[in-house]
Amino acid sequence: MNRNSFFTYIFCIMTFVFVFAFPSDGAERAAPFRIAAGDGSTLTMEDLSGKIVLCFYETRDTKDKNSALKDELRKFRDQLFEKEKDILYVLPVVDCSGASRLFIGKWKDSLIRESEKAGYTVYGDWDGKMRDDNKFLRNESNFALINKDGSITYLTHGLIEEREISLILRKVRSLMGKEVLF
């Protein structure tokens, strides 16, 4: 390999790594939101500043659709040191905007039960604003990977296939400094 092609090769790799490891200034930012858990505790986008967020936005009917991705991300998270786990925030959100006022108490109880089962606080989007502002699809399983700076690094809807799961895991590892994408 001659000297020029070597430097060209290095330049291409560095450019590729930079493009995928750091969101561009043009990356879409996650819209501000305010969501509430079944126990009444609230969470805003500002509360997640400096964290890598794994956001699952789903309905009661679609919450099991991407269990394979959830399992893989759980395995990855379980391998992390406690300090690293603090950086990676799992954010399950249920679209509660269709809840009738008569049944809000039951919805809140359900969020509490789901939180206990999941090991994470499950939040409700009670007015649908988070869904609409972040371009999540109604009545669908949505996943967003949000970088520490609040930019949406990856957004997808529907059933996430195995190949896409691998890509998401690589992006998460890259954002955490665990893997270089190339």
Where is each model-derived feature located?
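Short active-site neighborhood of thiol/selenol oxidoreductases, capturing the structured segment around
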Residues: 46-69
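Thiol-/selenol-based redox modules, centered on thioredoxin-like
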Residues: 139-182
